[in-house]
Amino acid sequence: MRTGIIAQKVGMTSVFNDKGERISLTLVKVDDCQVVGHKTLAKHGYNALVIGVKDQKISKVTKPMKQVFANAKIAPKTKLKEFRISEDNFIDIASILEVDHFRVGQFVDITATTIGKGFAGSMKRHNFRGLEASHGVSISHRSHGSTGQRQDPGKVFKGKKMAGHMGCNKVTIQNLKIFAVDTNRKLIMIQGSIPGHKNSYLLVKDAIKKAAITIA
C-alpha cells in the first residue's frame, strides 16, 4: 500500500476521443508536496507517512510544529495529512512527491470536501417531494411534514431528515481513472467530477478496489 498525495483542484475541462465521444476531465495540481515525517509500527502502532503541502510563514506555525519541521529540515507547511502505508513503502523525509507518482490508466480514490450550500430546506437537502400544491395545503408547500410521534417518545429522533446546513461534507469518490499526466505543468487529468470548489485541497490515493497500476 503506497502513500497518497495532497493535491489542489484547478477546475474542469473536456476532450474528445477518437470515437468523437466527449470526456469530462477534472484538472488536479500537485505542487510542493513533501514528506514531513514517519509513523512506525514500533513507536506509533501503525505505519504511515506524514505529507505536507504549500509553504507557510514561520510566524503562523506553533512552537511544537516548528520543532517538527526543524527536525525534518524543511520549510513549514500549510496542510498536513497522514497516509497509511505498508512497511516496504517508506519514503525518505524531505522527499518531494511529483505527479509521476501516478500513471495514465491508473484508478484512484479521491477524498474532498463538498461545496457548502448554507441552510437548505428538506426538498433541496434530501430531495423530498413536498406537500400538495393545492387542495387544502396553506403556506407549507415545501415543508417536510411531521417530524415525530406524540408524548411517547416525546422527542425527534437523531438523524431525522430535516432542513439544515447542506454541504461541507467529507466525501470519497472511488475508482476514478487518470486520463493524462502533465509533468511540465504538474497536472493530473482525471475522468469525471470531483467534489469541492476551485483551489480546494483533496487527497489522491491508489484505488483500494482496483489493481494498483492499470495501463490503458
From Swiss-Prot:
GO BP annotations, alphabetical order: translation
Cellular component, GO, one term: ribosome
SUPFAM superfamilies according to UniProt: Translation proteins
Pfam families reported for this sequence: Ribosomal_L3
Gene name of this polypeptide: rplC
Its job: One of the primary rRNA binding proteins, it binds directly near the 3'-end of the 23S rRNA, where it nucleates assembly of the 50S subunit.
Region: Disordered, residue numbers: 136-155
Quaternary structure and interacting proteins, as annotated: Part of the 50S ribosomal subunit. Forms a cluster with proteins L14 and L19.
Protein name: Large ribosomal subunit protein uL3
Sequence similarity: Belongs to the universal ribosomal protein uL3 family.
Post-translational modification: Methylated by PrmB.
Keywords: Methylation, Ribonucleoprotein, Ribosomal protein, RNA-binding, rRNA-binding
Organism: Rickettsia prowazekii (strain Madrid E)
